[in-house]
Amino acid sequence: MNEYTIHFGGLAGHSSKPHLGVSAVEYASRYVNKLLEIREELKKRGPKDCIFDPPHSTLSIGGIKGGIAHNVIADKCSVEWETRPVTKADAEFVTNEIDKFANEALLPEMQKVFPQSFIKKEVIGEVVGFDRLDQSEACEFVSSITGDNSREVVSFGTEAGLFQEVGISTVVCGPGSIEQAHKIDEFIELDEIKKCLKFLEGVKDKSVN
């Protein structure tokens, strides 16, 4: 999962003379439209027999912030977005396409009117993907406690990939459901908490023995 905030800087002015200003909001809007085009391309690039749901890399616009009034050309705007690539190639595709558009299409237009115009990319986080392995000490350890030998994949991110990248056998196991995550009144069922406590007791017993 890769998260970014893109900062646009233009030139403020009165809306009656738009040719004398550089609207950061307008250029940010064009940037977002390009992201949406890329998102459609990602759907076509989904690998065959993909085990994820949906079966392709995703891209989402989380927020657009800019402008102070109807009659003022906005000199500042920011776009918050993320992508969840299912392949490394998709991650590179998204980065190359949107950066090229920003630097070669948008920025020259902005700086033609106001040389100090800018587009700055702030990396909020780039989380390494977590691969499902056929053989995993961590999975076998968890299965020995839970009795569940299933192996599932999900389309949301954790820090598991960071541990796996440095050679630590890793598994994601815990209470709750993504269906209740990141929403108003987010919750975990009490039965899930009870299962978690039982699991932790099992971890303790296995560690002692």
Predicted regions and their residues:
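Metal-dependent amide/peptide-bond hydrolase catalytic core
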Residues: 2-209
